Amino acid sequence: MFTSVPPIATLSSRRIIPENLQGRVLMKLVYVVLEPQYQSAMSAAVKSINKNNSNLAIEVSGYLIEELRSPENYEVFKEDIAKADIFIASLIFIDDLATKIAQAVAPHRDRLSACVVFPSMPEVMRLNKMGSFSMENLGQSKSAIAQFMRKRKEKSGSSFQDSMLKVVQTLPKILKYMPMDRAQDARNFMLSFQYWLGGSTENIENFLLMLAQNYLPTVKEKAKENGSGLLQIKDPVTYLDMGLWHPLAPKMFESTAEYLAWFNTRIDIPDDMKDPLAPCVGLLMARTHLVTGDDAHYVAMVQELESLGARVISVFNGGLDFSKAVEEYFYDPKQKDRAIVDSVVSLTGFALVGGPAKQDHPKAIEALEKLNRPYMVALPLVFQTTEEWQDSDLGLHPVQVALQVALPELDGGLDPIVLSGRDSATGRSHALSDRVETIANRAIKWANLRRKPRHEKKLAITIFSFPPDKGNIGTAAYLDVFSSIHKVAEALRDNGYDITDLPKTSHDMMTEILHDPEAMVGSPELNIAYKMSVSEYEANTPYVEDIIEQWGAAPGHLNSDGQNLLIYGKQYGNLFVGVQPTFGYEGDPMRLLFSKSASPHHGFVAYYTYLNHIWGADAVLHFGTHGSMEFMPGKQVGMSGDCYPDSLIGALPNIYYYAVNNPSEGTIAKRRGYATIISYITPAPENAGLSRNLQELSELIASYKDLRLGGRGVQITNTIMDKVRLVNLDKDVELPEQDAKDMSLEERDNVIGQVYNKLMEIESRVLPCGLHVVGEPPKVEDVTDVLTSIASFDRPEDNMKSLLRIMCDSIGRDIEQLYKSSDKGIYADVELLANIRAIANKAVGALVKAKADDDGRVSKLSVLNFFRMGKTEPWIEVFQDNGYPNVNKDDIKPLFEFLEFCLKQIVADNELGGLIKALEGDYILPSPGGDPIRNPLVLPTGKNMHALDPNSIPTSAAVQAAKTVVDRLLERQRQDNNGVYPETIAVVLWGTDNIKTYGESLAQVLCMIGVKPMPDALGR
């Protein structure tokens, strides 16, 4: 999967041994860092000292944190630590590696002359020691200073780091005049921060000299003999912590006004680029790359954007909170509430606030929502070299996917495209020119969506004809595609887009595109929108030779008339509705996913060539879950220019309607199709119901209630058992061999109870019913089913009981015991549970009906028009009238307030609004995907759906739900096995299910083996 890391001993650039000491003191140094840019600065500083300093020589061994996963490298690291004088570490936030580092260094801490650790996990920070200064008791100190710092952190939250930077900058000036050793050691620790954050070769060189002068015993002894300092040390060279930068500028700038004033004096660019109306792209950069001189990839990005005619405003920040830079520099200096950038690209590769440490996504979202611009996150390779990435079928290292792809997605980040690689020997970054070009082109395309008038924008809607079952064209999971497209087209027309000749109905539109509503995939009856000659196709498809190698010469036999490539679809003014071709391997669809030689066919490629280069779309809308473009061969994440999804989509902004309950495959569209997801709600769940034979059985059981005590009780019991055998339900319910006349009333009740319970289980299975239409308000019964399902879950994280539990409590029963007795087939309890469920649905229905309009639908307007006017809530009346008058109102009130909140989220029509915002080049709010029943926070739909926070699963709710499931499973297994618990249990783990349930399956496994997940020191 990934190229193995070479042994550290072979990496000569980071293992530097001075050739000749010539009487100099030797200091042995070991460092571990996250950021490879420090590798080149450290190596240059050590080489400079070894060459120029007559009193000190340094032997250094350097490590990038991910290299310590290799057992061989870790053993070499421990050997180096055992011989070291000084240990330095920075940004060690990967929990398992932080533990390994702490375990390796801690036994040698007292012997080491100094340990200097910059922001990292607490167990690594505790290694800090410089003379009398120590962090050994970090987090445990009761000193006034420690308590002050804790309170400061709690109060300021994510801005704590910025406060700390101010302390680092000012405290050394104060401590300088305090004579005590402890004060001087504390001052040296603060100075170390300044040297390190300065990052230049000069600063790192003086940092190492300062450590040797003050903490290396042999240097200190020689200094005493000389009566003065042995080494000449300069104070840290300080740089702006936050500001603006340009590779051609003479300096860094503190304000946007100052930067623009310089920008407008340039003679190397045309006057058009100085015009405030020119497309403007904002770049976010890490200051460490600038001060260490490791900025080749930043220079390349600025140059590429400017070559495309864009103004570039590139800003940097020294901390981990880039929201301040966004708010400070991306607005007009003369009009502070007006953003001057049209799109933003982060080149840091990390979350906007918090970087690789603890993120603050709400703060990031607040800043980005205010800016309201598309936000792309490009990826510098941090955890792997260029060669490792190029050779990997997976693409990005899993840790890099988590930190640099998954976490920025929670901020609303788009287009995770690799920006730069790094040299395995020097650690220096280098731009990947074709990737830089792709990022720049996409940034400008997003910017142009903001700038172009609506009536001039050309849009493409792509519908699917998805094999292998050759289903009807225009299908998508849970979505009425043509009705939804018609609604979207009407909304676009009403908002000023040039949509002409739109059919009156969705059926008419479908007929125009298909000609025959029953047309199957590959049917010649599809409407031909364009015939593309082979010469035109080849001229506009740079990678056509790769397709010819697999499929032969164009045009091929798919989507072709033998001479031309055929583009199916229909044009409505500036809207093109096109049919995505099949992927070509209908007989063996898995070949496309697993064969390295597979590729899209000429017809498939021609469709996207048409959208990009001939139709000239400003954006494409993939309509529904899901198409096949994002599943084309290539790396899984962090694609190269040779990966087909990257080549197919090109620079087109890709907006994708996706079912909210499928974030796992939606994530594939985001990462491989560069999609901005607009989620749509799935149809309301309905009970599966019973087949005709099972319904007849249910009616017999209903009759049993009235006949059980009379003479016909035996007869109807026998009839029910015969019916159970007839419908093959006896395979699920164990029936006695004897006649009912030989059974007691209790035994008959138990048999009928077990059958009744099995029927309830079958009938109450929840299935989505119908198809969703984008922009159409839901029906009362649909909303009732959704809210009833939501109300059926305990939510301990919100201190909220389920509705069934509240109703059980009101009659003195425990819901868990009721489930158990119902599972055992105790007839009275099976009947009670059925009644509770029915009344719960009726109570929730009363809430929904009170907020419905005259058409039996629930809209934003009808919800707002509901007033109680001091009346008893209708759901309370349902409880009072149906045998549950004693429900605890303190429990019911928060639950129904929550259900009202969920109702508002369900009817919030943001699916059309979200699409129109995306087409305007606005920022689309991120939102988790998943099951709306388990997690109503995925609502309202119409947001940029992401998967999950890898640092947050399993959630506490998932752990609680998992425990309930495991307890019930084990109890049922015990009952079915004569009181014996199972010895082994097999569990199938699906990524999709874990994303939907926020890690419930993982939590089940943990529960079964008897462990409970605990957060790390950062709460992850």
Predicted regions and their residues:
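Ligand/cofactor-recognition surfaces for anionic moieties
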Residues: 2-77, 82-1020
